[in-house]
UniProtKB/Swiss-Prot annotation:
Acts as a component of the essential kinetochore-associated NDC80 complex, which is required for chromosome segregation and spindle checkpoint activity. Belongs to the SPC25 family. This is Probable kinetochore protein SPC25. Component of the NDC80 complex, which consists of NDC80, NUF2, SPC24 and SPC25. Residues 1-23 are annotated as: Disordered. Pfam families: Spindle_Spc25. The gene is SPC25. It comes from Gibberella zeae (strain ATCC MYA-4620 / CBS 123657 / FGSC 9075 / NRRL 31084 / PH-1). The keyword Cell membrane does not apply. Residues 57-143 form a coiled coil.
Length: 257
């Protein structure tokens, strides 16, 4: 219906319009719009636009890669910090356990101190009653000590001149005597103490600076309590062979164990 209306309207308009002269389009001048130049500029624009797009795409890719690297670094930092936190937590827990242990030990020490203080008070209470008895026995003790010192000096002076006996024990105990780097020390070195290796050596250093002899160092290690027992026998008898035989027995026992 709309089509019929437009057709009838166009026909009526043609009938009502007066005739005209030549066509206006034929009278327009011939104008050169420069389509070739426009096409060339469009091509250049397209090339620049494509280059811009490519550069933008490359920049976006670079930024995305950089972003991924930054994220990876942040994740690694987070992992390291988490590990550091775990280490700190472990150390904190260990430290707390140590503190608790020290507190328990402190309580035990306080209990022991209180017990010792009580014992001390008991000893102090009986001290006055013992003073009289101590005074009575002091003279006797001094007399006995003087006799022991005299005997010890005599034994020591005799032992210095008993070289043949010392040579005998050196030979029979597979022993040699060396200097220990100090004027008041002697080093006694044994062999044939290890059944698996007769050449293996065992030694100890004897300190002679005081009246009572002492052993400072020995290899292999032996129990100090056993060494003290040997030293007690030596200091009581003042016979060096007691020490030489006793220490060799301790070394043989240590090698077997």
């Amino acid at each position: 219906m709309a089509t019929d209306f437009r057709s009838s309207f166009s026909a009526s308009m043609r009938q009502s319009m007066p005739p005209v002269g030549p066509s206006v389009a034929n009278q327009l001048p011939n104008i050169n719009f420069g389509f070739d130049d426009l096409r060339d500029r469009m091509a250049k624009f397209t090339a620049r636009f494509d280059a811009f797009i490519e550069e933008g795409r490359k920049r976006v890719l670079d930024e995305r890669n950089q972003f991924r690297m930054n994220v990876a670094e942040l994740q690694e930092d987070q992992r390291m910090k988490k590990r550091d936190i775990e280490i700190v937590q472990t150390k904190t827990a260990t430290h707390q356990q140590t503190i608790e242990k020290e507190k328990a030990e402190t309580r035990e020490m306080e209990t022991a101190i209180n017990s010792l203080a009580s014992q001390r008070d008991n000893h102090l209470s009986t001290r006055d009653s013992l003073k009289a008895e101590i005074a009575q026995t002091q003279a006797e003790i001094e007399t006995r000590l003087a006799a022991q010192r005299e005997y010890a000096q005599h034994q020591q002076s005799q032992s210095r001149f008993n070289v043949p006996e010392l040579d005998f024990w050196i030979t029979n105990l597979c022993l040699k005597i060396e200097g220990a780097g100090h004027d008041d020390r002697l080093k006694f070195v044994y062999t044939h103490v290890d059944e698996k290796d007769w050449e293996r050596e065992a030694w100890f250093e004897l300190v002679t600076s005081s009246r009572d002899y002492d052993v400072k160092h020995c290899r292999p290690k032996v129990e100090r309590e056993k060494v003290e027992k040997v030293l007690d026998k030596l200091n009581e008898s003042r016979e060096l062979v007691v020490l030489l035989k006793g220490m060799r027995e301790l070394f043989v026992e240590a090698m077997k164990s």
